[in-house]
Amino acid sequence: MRILLVLRGNYYAGQEEFIKNNKLQNYTLDLNALRLLSGSVKNIVSEYKILNVKNDEDLSKILLKLLEMRMQKGEFSIINAYNETLKIYKDLAKQYRYKIYVIVFDSSLKQCQEKNLLEAKKNGYIIPYALLEKTQDLLKKIQKNTQF
């Protein structure tokens, strides 16, 4: 099944619930999971830790390599990477004859901030508010120009 599903939206906009509720964990490549695996965690002054985005360029390359490995075998794949651009996925889809479907999770910044705090209380990791704001702004700009 040559289908690539790209989940777009800010952090905690509903992607994780969608994946869990539909039992899609085994098909999902997630940038935050790679951040945790790479040890990209920073302690901050508060009781929480943050996922360090400093290595995101390298982790994005790893994510794309993992995706390409799946695509070479024709496997159904889901990307949860908070992407502002879809071009790289379009190129891979064309190369491996995949159909792309994009699900946009359009939660407000306030909703994402509230969910961020709730999740931080559960798991000890918080996404910096500045990153939530930056991601929200980028997604707004890009969504206006995105066509499939």
PLM region spans:
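Hydrophobic/aromatic beta-strand patches that form the interior of the parallel beta-sheet core
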Residues: 5, 27-29, 101-103
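Conserved GTP-binding G-domain of TRAFAC-class P-loop NTPases and closely related GTPase folds
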Residues: 2-8, 13, 17, 25-26, ...
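Short, surface-exposed basic-aromatic patches at helix termini and helix-loop junctions that form
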Residues: 21-23, 90-97
